[in-house]
């Protein structure tokens, strides 16, 4: 993450949920949240596209997973969830189609999800608010981390300056002793 900014939000979805994914992405971008979507970022024919997806999840601040019966059956959605867990990313589940049992993967059953099935506008507002809060928290943590790094560097520089001053003082004392010895020998 660059200083004082948050990374993108990775969007995990089944191709059959592309329309719902596009509405979610449009809403998030309208709120100033950067969304990473594979069909926009991957160049067709890229031989290592799986690695590009992994890198995108690794660099993401969070993952939004679009839930539906098709998403639950998707090997790719499962792989992306696995990577999100592996990279310790906060996952925001969004239910767009189907009932809970047929749409929500067992790895997500204990997580609160956003339901877009009955009131999409209210659900999107809820998702946007939750993501904004979380991204603000990450930004605050990053600011605190950078401040701590700056303070540690300041303390390190102060210690180096103190050591240099002590060394210079010791050299002056040694030089004075030598000069005093030379004067004593001359007498």
Where are these regions (language model features)?
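Conserved N-terminal substructure of TIR/SEFIR domains
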Residues: 1-66, 70, 85-89, 122-137, ...
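Long, low-complexity, compositionally biased polyampholytic IDRs enriched for Lys/Glu and Gln/Arg
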Residues: 139-187
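Glycine-rich, charge-decorated loop segments at or immediately adjacent to ligand/cofactor-binding or catalytic sites
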Residues: 99-111
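Conserved nucleotide-binding/hydrolysis micro-motifs of P-loop NTPases
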Residues: 71, 97-102, 120
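Short acidic-hydrophobic, aromatic-tinged amphipathic segments that line or gate anion-handling sites
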Residues: 113-119
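A short, gly/pro- and small-residue-rich
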Residues: 76-90
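Conserved beta-strand/loop subsegment of P-loop NTPase cores
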Residues: 91-95
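Short, hinge-like loop/turn segments at secondary-structure boundaries
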Residues: 53-56, 108-112
